[in-house]
Every structure is written in C-alpha cells, then in structure tokens.
Amino acid sequence: MRVLVDQVAIDRPGVDLLYDVIMPSTTVAVPSVICIHGGGWISGDRTEMHPVASKFAENGFAAFCVGYRLAPLHPYPAAIEDCQFLVKHLRENAHSIGIKSDCIAAFGNSAGGHLAASLAVRDIPGDISCRVDAAIDVCGLTDLTNPQQNHPMISWDFIKQFLGSKYEEDTSKWIDASPLFHVTEQSAPTLIFHGDEDDIVWIEQSKRLFEAMQEKGVPSRFEVLSGEGHSFTLGAFDRILNESIEFLSEQFSK
C-alpha cells in the first residue's frame, strides 16, 4: 500500500482542504472510498480514519480521509461543502490519481455518517456530480430537526454549534442540513448501520432514512447492531467494515 498525507484538494487562505490517501498496491484504476470522521461536527481529525482506510485499501479500494472544516468556527454548510468538493476533485482528477470516476463511495460514523448520507442524497448543479456512487452511514443523524428521543440536550447542543443558529431562528437551515429531506430516486445506494442501544443518536434516525430510500426505490439496507451503543465493540466494527466492503464490491460490480 502507498500512504500519502497532507494532499491539497483546495488551496485557500486560512484553511486548506486536506486529505490523506491510502492506495492499494496496483497499477490499475480502482474504486474509492471517502472516509469521514465523527466528532459532532466540532472535533475530530482525518487521521482517526486511517485504520478504516487501511482496511479498505487492503481490499482493493483507494481510501481518502478528509479533513473537513469544523464548527463552530466554520458552521454549516462548510463541512458538507468540503466533502462535496472532494468528490468533485476526485472525479476531475481520477485518471491521475488512479481511481474510477464512477465508483466513488463515502463512509462515515456519527457526524461523519451524517456527512456520508448527505453525499448520497445531495448534489450541486454542474458538469461534474458531487454525489457519491454509494454510501455507508454508521449511526449518523438524518433529521436534525428531531435529533434524539431520550437525551435531547446531547444532540441539540452539537447541532446548534454545527448550524450556527437555534431551530426557531432559522428552521429552513435545520431542514436543509438533514439528509432525510433530500432523498430522491437519484440518491445513491446506501448501507446503514445503527446500534439498538445508542443513547446519543436515536436509532429511529437511521430507520427513517432507510424507509425514505425504500419509498423512493433507492437500493438500501439497514443493519441493526444488537446490544451496541454509539461507540462500537471491536467485533461490531469488524462486522461493519466487512459488510461495507461486500456492499461496495457488489455495487461497483454492476
């Protein structure tokens, strides 16, 4: 495998958009996965996803760990825009990077799951699509207007910092930032994981996204992880990665 760090997708004043990439040992173009870290949109670092990226690379995927801008310094839509721009950057430069431009996926957990789901359901008009070709959402929020049944203050505080406003101040922003309300027939195939004992992000969030995708005819699966909370055991995370690799291999072989 080849590891390249501090690659620049956007050279901009103050905050470059950087990514690290782990490439499999091959000379042919390969499918790719954008690995998006969690942290409530306000913390975390792309290096946290290196173990995940290594697993994908070992199985023939180029894995890109993105360092998106964090709130509250950079509120919505900064994080989503950064992830979308990386998709565009990879498609524009697919030949030189060594990846397939039509086999780009996103994988994320928690806040990263929200961003991965956003990449599956959202696009920006233009010649080059910013929507991924498949996504894996691991316990991500999908409806920011209704974050948590049991512990509302946990999620509300993170969301307010992420969006930069209270719900009653800018309801439309809270709706716009929610992947659930962007699902269409064109949304990318999505694999969703959620622990049934998650006390940070309500499992209903994932169930509702799955149901919305099923209603629109989007290829999707919902895997409930029995006995798992928001942080997974090693065995559960191995299952997540193995099933994600199988899912992407299946989608990209069509």
State where each predicted segment sits.
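Alpha/beta-hydrolase superfamily serine-hydrolase fold, recognizing
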Residues: 1-254
